[in-house]
Amino acid sequence: MIIILIFLIIPNIVLSIDYWVSFNKTIILDSNITNDNNDINGVSWNFLNNSLNTLATCGKAGNFCECSNYSTSLYNIAHNCSLTIFPHNDVFGTPYQVVWNQIINYTIKLLTPVTPPNITYNCTNFLITCKKNNGTNTIIYFNINDTNVKYTNESILEYNWNNSNFNNFTATCIINNTINSSNDTQTIDCINTLLSSYLDFFQVASYMFYMIIFIATGIIASIFISIITFLSLRKRKKHVEEIESPSPSESNEEEQCQHDDTTSIHEPSPREPLLPKPYSRYQYNTPIYYMRPLTQPLNPSPLPKLCPPPKPCPPPKPCPPPKPCPPPKPCPSSESCSPPESYSLPKPLPNIPLLPNIPPLSTQNISLIHVDRII
């Protein structure tokens, strides 16, 4: 297929033509010389390979074109001086030129088959894009509901549709060349797409809402537990301080007892520890003993069990015979003895009077009361 880009109207204007041909095909380049042209001298075919080289020199006489100095294995020149190029590897990308009363430049390009295009659309901008994948010398046609609305020979076709007229429609992109044709069809449905985007947004928002509720609940629960712990520790501390510190009445009793006779025995307070206080109320848990007169009678002790009868004693062993006494020693000569010392009686002990209300210690029932310290 020959595509003429610039038509020759005025003489001596260069005409450029892109010639698309598939691989291993014979190429025919038209000289644009007709039978109306009379004898023409100086027709030449040239090719450009880093420099302009002459391929053949021809002359036309009547309906016959005669040329010389060209390779018949690669080229052939017809009666109207058109050039036929047989398939070979160096033909693509090589410019050819025919010169006579006018100049025509040919560019040989390889024609390749097309593959299905890609269709994409954007519901925000209402834009449809049709893009070519493979193929040369192609034309792209775009149809909406089997009606052609646009075409181009570029690689990308873009179309903005009217949202008021089209909401749910079928878009078809067709791409073809002289070798083959291919197409792709998409259903454009922006209503469902917008709804799905809204649903996705609401789903994400719900996830965020539940996450915020979960975090806020955890923070509130932590604050509530901290307050309860603080109040319980404060109450416990106050309770321990009340136990360790005596009441005002007990303090008065202790002061009154201090003014009494030091020999008197006073009743200890139930909260008065007889052991020294620990350095810290959390240091250790030590039982504290208090002495208090027993107000209730003691439980009667059970009767002792009867002892078994004594076992009979074995008969006594016979005594050995007595040893003879030694003879008495002679008494020393008597000396005058000193008169014995007179004996003085010991001094009587002082009589310490006891308080009339307090019986002697021997008559008091004293019990030990076990009190655990509360921590």
Swiss-Prot record:
Task: Give the keywords, sorted.
Answer: Disulfide bond, Glycoprotein, Host Golgi apparatus, Host membrane, Late protein, Membrane, Receptor, Repeat, Signal, Transmembrane, Transmembrane helix, Virion
What residues bear carbohydrate chains?
24, 80, 105, 122, 134, 145, 168, 176, 183
Q: Which cysteines are joined by disulfide bonds?
A: 123-190, 130-173
On the Extracellular side, which residues?
A: 17-207
Q: How does it sit in the membrane?
A: Single-pass type I membrane protein
What triggers expression? Expressed in the late phase of the viral replicative cycle.
Where composition is biased (Basic and acidic residues), the residues are: 256-270
Q: Where in the cell is it found?
A: Host membrane; Virion membrane; Host Golgi apparatus
Q: What do we know about how this protein assembles, alone or with others?
A: Both glycosylated and nonglycosylated forms interact (via C-terminus) with the host AP-1 complex.
Record remark: domains: The C-terminus contains repetitive amino-acids that may function as a cell-penetrating peptide.
Q: What is this protein called?
A: CD2 homolog
Question: Organism source for this protein?
Answer: African swine fever virus (isolate Tick/Malawi/Lil 20-1/1983) (ASFV)
